[in-house]
Amino acid sequence: MTNPVAQQRTIDELLQKGVINLDKPAGPTSHEVAAWVKRILHIKKAGHIGTLDPKVTGVLPILLQDATRAVGALVNLPKEYVCVLHLHKTVPDPLVRDILREFTGVLYQRPPLKSAVRRQIRKREIYYIDVLERQGNDVLFKVGCEAGTYIRKLCHDVGEALGVGAHMQELRRTKAGPFDESKLSTLHDLTDAYHFWIEDHDEAPLRDIIMPVERALSHLPKIIIRDTAVDAICHGAQLAEPGVISLPDVDRKQLVGIYTARDEIVALGISVLQGGVIAKVKRVMMEPGTYPRYWKSRKIRKHEEGA
């Protein structure tokens, strides 16, 4: 019997392998928020994608249970933030906009003293910076950037470039990979939805919050495989050409998603595209035995050959 397709999974199945697009409140750490999600849903494991400092709010995707296997494919996704930059002295608006534009492209940053990681110089890319509004010495801007970019440090450097000094007043993450603010849920929403499911047997609110893990992996090139190849992949076998239904245009050594014809994620892999091997499995996402077994182990083959 095959897995239900992603959109038809039961609540229990979503709790086992789902993702929540959570609106992180100001105050707690990202780790604390993930721990609260575990307690609310009475599950054993939850992990977050991309760490937000305690005062920062916004998009914090939470992976549930088996979905945490996918975290390695998600931590380096591009991010977008909306930030309030406070200038320490008044600067003409055109100059502020010109200086901000100069920060697009590749930057070299050392994490700020308040960060939770080692303060080693890192290279990061700013994709775009757009000024949204200005009130006095407060500048509201939107920035799209590579994962691991420190917006606090960006604000400091902008102030230095302007010659007046500046700091980050407020920060909110508005995008993390395929997740944005269009379908955010709060911890309060999650608590209420779980209560409705347990007490009133109404699963609609919880189903509206927990998405299939495939939603988090929608950015990856998708290889579609035959049902006969699924269980072998679930046991860690390499994906060979005969097992492939559809192959996207990918480069070698690229991270890919390996899917069934029903759009269920089977595994994450690295494209090989050589010697009849299409991809090497990096992380199995589907439980073995979900699909019928069509392959034979080396031990069984040797036994049959010797019979």
Whereabouts are the PLM-identified features?
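Accessory RNA 3′-end/elbow-binding domains used by RNA modification enzymes
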Residues: M1-I49, I121, D138, A161, ...
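RNA pseudouridine synthases
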Residues: M1-S185
